[in-house]
Amino acid sequence: MNPLIQSLTEGQLRTDIPSFRPGDTVRVHAKVVEGSRERIQIFEGVVISRKSQGISEMYTVRKISSGIGVERTFPIHTPRVEKIEVVRHGKVRRAKLYYLRALQGKAARIKEIRR
């Protein structure tokens, strides 16, 4: 990578990110701006993918809300995310869990592991 680009991105990388992988259940505290005020909205779900590396790294979280699947994609190093909590670790054998979109109910459960 170009040394100039690398020096610019190093200052913007966050160090308070816990280690999590696809299959883990996370609680994301995201800042939401509504008009002139700002509040924190918690989005809890299963991580179904992690993409890229460095400053452009992203992850997708999926949850079921009122029987409808909702997915949100967040950049790892964004200041819009207050914090990320790992609720539990799941045992999966894939890097991308897009097959969970077709499953519902008990079939969409992920076995928990101790880490």
UniProtKB/Swiss-Prot annotation:
Which of UniProt's keywords are assigned here? Ribonucleoprotein, Ribosomal protein
Instruction: Kindly list the biological process annotations in GO that this record carries.
Output: translation
Query: Which Gene3D superfamilies does this UniProt record tie to the protein?
Result: 2.30.30.790
Signal peptide range in chain numbering: none
Which is one GO molecular function term here?
A: structural constituent of ribosome
What's an example GO cellular component term for this entry?
Answer: cytosolic large ribosomal subunit
One Pfam family named in its UniProt record: Ribosomal_L19
- Which superkingdom heads the taxonomic lineage of this protein's source? Bacteria
What InterPro entries does its record include? Ribosomal_bL19, Ribosomal_bL19_CS, Ribosomal_bL19_sf, Translation_prot_SH3-like_sf
Q: Which NCBIfam families match?
A: rplS_bact
Q: Report the sequence similarity comment from the record.
A: Belongs to the bacterial ribosomal protein bL19 family.
Q: Which HAMAP family match?
A: Ribosomal_bL19 (MF_00402)
The job of this chain, per UniProt, is described as:
This protein is located at the 30S-50S ribosomal subunit interface and may play a role in the structure and function of the aminoacyl-tRNA binding site.
Which named protein is this? Large ribosomal subunit protein bL19
* Protein species of origin: Streptococcus equi subsp. equi (strain 4047)
Q: What is the lineage of its organism?
A: Bacteria, Bacillati, Bacillota, Bacilli, Lactobacillales
